[in-house]
Amino acid sequence: MPPLHAPPPHTKVAIIGAGFGGIVMAIRLQQHGIYDFIILEKGSDFGGTWRDNQYPGAACDVQSHLYSLSFAPKSNWSKRYAEAPEIFSSIQDLVTDYNLRAFCRLNTEVLAAHYQAERCLWQLQLQDQSIL
């Protein structure tokens, strides 16, 4: 599936943010046979805090193995407390392994979310003024 260049006019699930939470949500949807979703990320890449905080010495404050997902365990961490670049790299591996770029629109900020009760759906206003 090619990457999305514009959000579709309607999607079953919109995931706001491509940090760990958004990534895991997207993977779990796929594992349950749901592919009608989009990930909206205001940043330029996946990774959330691990994308944004790669200053010298940045590292996790819990043991690295806790950054492994139960369905995608990582056992080859280089240190007991992994540094930011290694965590970011493991996130990128998940993105590649689950083809998440095909479902993501980067550099896309969600400005507002409004529930449309009469239609039983959410309407998202994006920074480029489009509506999803």
Identify the residue ranges that each predicted region occupies.
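A short, basic/flexible loop-to-alpha-helix module at the beginning of a structural domain
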Residues: 1-11
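Residue-level preference for short coil/turn positions at secondary-structure junctions
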Residues: 7-9, 33, 100, 120
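N-terminal Rossmann-like FAD-binding beta1-loop-alpha1 element of flavoenzymes
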Residues: 11-39
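Conserved Rossmann-like nucleotide-cofactor binding loop
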Residues: 21, 44-45
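Glycine-rich active-site loop/strand segments that organize a redox cofactor
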Residues: 42, 49-93
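Active-site loop signature of alpha/beta-hydrolase-fold enzymes
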Residues: 45-46, 113
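Feature captures the FAD/FMN-dependent oxidoreductase FAD-binding
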Residues: 79-132
